[in-house]
Curated annotation (Swiss-Prot):
Alphabetical UniProt keywords: Chloroplast, Membrane, NAD, NADP, Plastid, Plastoquinone, Quinone, Thylakoid, Translocase, Transmembrane, Transmembrane helix, Transport
A Pfam cross-reference name: Ndh2_N
One GO CC term, this protein: chloroplast thylakoid membrane
Coiled coil stretches, renumbered: none
The organism of origin for this protein: Hordeum vulgare (Barley)
Single GO biological process annotation from the record: photosynthesis, light reaction
Tagged with keyword Zinc-finger: no
Protein name according to UniProt: NAD(P)H-quinone oxidoreductase subunit 2 A, chloroplastic
Transcription regulation recorded as keyword: no
Protein location: Plastid, Chloroplast thylakoid membrane
Membrane topology, from the record: Multi-pass membrane protein
The family this protein is said to belong to: Belongs to the complex I subunit 2 family.
Gene: ndhB1
EC number: 7.1.1.-
Function, as annotated: NDH shuttles electrons from NAD(P)H:plastoquinone, via FMN and iron-sulfur (Fe-S) centers, to quinones in the photosynthetic chain and possibly in a chloroplast respiratory chain. The immediate electron acceptor for the enzyme in this species is believed to be plastoquinone. Couples the redox reaction to proton translocation, and thus conserves the redox energy in a proton gradient.
Length: 510
């Protein structure tokens, strides 16, 4: 009898919880319509995988790409709407969050074509790969709009877990397994450190979890200038440093870049940074509003270390992917300048603009590496020697993307860095901008060294990989070249038409 009553109570409680969740989704679902499109795409992928055979593989790419494009369209239609807080304060919709969501969707849309031929050559399971990519995208989008500590952590872990699975997707590759283990351990440690910092915020604010309510709670408890806030700031900054690959928390990055499948590295190299930047900007600017001087100093130190170490270590690399790993550490150091400047002097606008340019430059470079790797099977920088003689289009595309990463005019990277450094200079960050300029010149050296190899015509320097180089006959390589062409064009001309981009970026205020 007692068991029967307890069972009835359990059913009633479960029904109430379900009805409450259904009510929230029914009345708040329109606020996460782009995310709902991705969820529908995920369900559709699973259904087709269960009911079809391998002959329907093109449908998997079509459904994934279409759901991403429709999600971008839905996001653009919602642009300039009034800021809304939904799901009982757990999720916020505003221009600032939406532009980061747009960048994540753009990254995923460009990355899927890069994976087509790679998956066919390595015989990877296509459905699971696309499911992980879409789920990671979904986690990144929720992270951009998360408005409380719990939602932030859940969305961050959703993105991180999919990243770990993608990193170790080629299970037979020992380097991939090693990279995954390092990524998992370092990612788990960084998440623990981040959550420990969150627990300090929760306690000091009197039990608040919403970002704005944490500020009000700190004022009410008079803890906004206490030593506990400094402890929370240190732990959260360290956790964010791992997620952003800031020096000295960058140790996992080169190994993960080198060991993971190249399309996965392309995806993680941009989406993880965009999502982490969205989190860092909001978590530092809102709860730590009263500690701005302290976190500005911390970020300045990390930015300087990242710019110097990243670019110095990139010079000595022999692997193209490891070189790009260290280059990305230096690049994120430049972006941090925009966070430090903040809303004043268009700091956030410069950060968003540079990230848009960085997406095109970085993905364009990785598209070239994917094509070269599939046709030669090597990742060594020396093996690129003389590529221009065999494939001028690929060599020129890679050269343009590398020059744009280095910041040479008139490419997009130059205008992005110019605007970023100008905003930093206007804000009085003279030393930081000077370091950025010096390390940018340093980065041009190792990019030009690779370009010189690409264009060399001396037979003694050309390796057997390029001598035996053949364009792939597979029809699917057109998708990689299409994505590469889009990125190369964007890396070349986006900087010339910066005014509309800046106008949009300047609208992304809290």
């Amino acid at each position: 009898m007692i068991w029967h009553v307890q069972n009835e109570n359990f059913i009633l409680d479960s029904t109430r919880i379900f009805m409450k969740a259904f009510h929230l989704l029914l009345f708040n679902g329109s606020f996460i319509f782009p995310e709902c499109i991705l969820i529908f795409g995920l369900i559709l992928l699973l259904m087709i995988d269960l009911t079809s055979d391998q002959k329907d593989r093109p449908w998997f790419y079509f459904i994934s790409s279409t759901s991403l494009v429709i999600s971008i369209t839905a996001l653009l239609f919602r642009w300039r709407e009034e800021p809304i807080i939904s799901f009982s304060g757990n999720f916020q919709t505003n221009n600032f969050n939406e532009i980061f969501q747009f960048l994540i969707l753009l990254c995923s849309t460009l990355c899927i074509p890069l994976s087509v031929e790679y998956i066919e050559c390595t015989e990877m399971a296509i459905t699971e790969f696309l499911l992980f990519v879409l789920t990671a995208t979904l986690g990144g989008m929720f992270l951009c709009g998360a408005n409380d500590l719990i939602t932030i952590f859940v969305a961050l872990e959703c993105f991180s877990l999919c990243s770990y699975l993608l990193s170790g997707y080629t299970k037979r590759d020992l380097r991939s397994n090693e990279a995954t283990m390092k990524y998992l351990l370092m990612g788990g440690a960084s998440s623990s450190i981040l959550v420990y910092g969150f627990s300090w915020l929760y306690g000091l604010s009197g039990g608040e979890i919403e970002l704005q309510e944490i500020v009000n709670g700190l004022i009410n408890t008079q803890m906004y200038n206490s030593p506990g806030i400094s402890i929370a700031l240190i732990f959260i900054t360290v956790g964010l440093g791992f997620k952003l690959s800031l020096a000295p928390f960058h140790q996992w990055t080169p190994d993960v870049y080198e060991g993971s499948p190249t399309p996965v590295v392309a995806f993680l190299s941009v989406t993880s940074k965009v999502a982490a930047l969205a989190l860092a900007t909001r978590i530092l600017d809102i709860p730590f509003y009263f500690s701005s001087n302290e976190w500005h100093l911390l970020l300045e130190i990390l930015a300087i270390l990242s710019m110097i170490l990243g670019n110095l270590l990139a010079i000595t690399q022999t692997s193209m992917k490891r070189m790009l790993a260290y280059s990305s550490i230096g690049q994120i150091g430049y972006v941090i300048i925009g966070i430090i400047v903040g809303d004043s002097n268009d700091g956030y606008a410069s950060m968003i603009t540079y990230m848009l340019f960085y997406i095109s430059m970085n993905l364009g470079t990785f598209a070239c590496i994917v094509l070269f790797g599939l046709r030669t099977g090597t990742d060594n920088i020396r093996d690129y020697a003389g590529l221009y003689m065999k494939d001028p289009f690929l060599a020129l595309s890679l050269a343009l993307c590398l020059l744009s990463l280095g910041g040479l005019p008139p490419l997009a990277g130059f205008f992005g860095k110019l605007y970023l450094f100008w905003c930093g200079w206007q804000a009085g960050l003279y030393f930081l901008v000077s370091i950025g300029l010096l390390t940018s010149v340093l980065s041009i050296y190792y990019y030009l060294k690779i370009i010189k190899l690409l264009m060399t015509g001396r037979n003694q320097e050309i390796t057997p990989y390029v001598r035996n180089y053949r364009r792939s006959p597979l029809r699917s390589n057109n998708s990689i070249e299409l994505s590469m062409t889009v990125c190369v064009i964007a890396s070349t001309i986006l900087g010339i038409s910066m005014n509309p981009i800046l106008a949009i970026a300047q609208d992304t205020l809290f």
